[in-house]
């Protein structure tokens, strides 16, 4: 497992990519600001972007009967949103919102799929 000390990312997943894999995805990464309460994913909707959080926290929220919601997960700088994309899916299982305003690296799902397929060979 790699842990590159000289790369300009705080996200633990990006820091652990091999130098070759990181070089192949960097042209497709874009740093974006994510204000608090920004909706990153919506239940049963197509996942538009995968976010590698650099700081802050995203909340994963499940819809319950009778209009109630419950938090089922948190994503921080050690993870990413859109994990279903890595498994071949394209739709979100839950809503995901930014809880704390911070920055992230945005990535198109198609590039994420290609990276995962290459890594599994």
Predicted features along the sequence, with ranges:
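Non-catalytic regulatory/interaction regions at protein termini and inter-domain linkers
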Residues: 1-16, 22-24
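Regulatory nucleotide-sensing modules
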Residues: 15-51
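Glycine- and acidic-residue-biased ligand/ion/polar-headgroup-sensing regions
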Residues: 37, 47-66, 76-80, 96
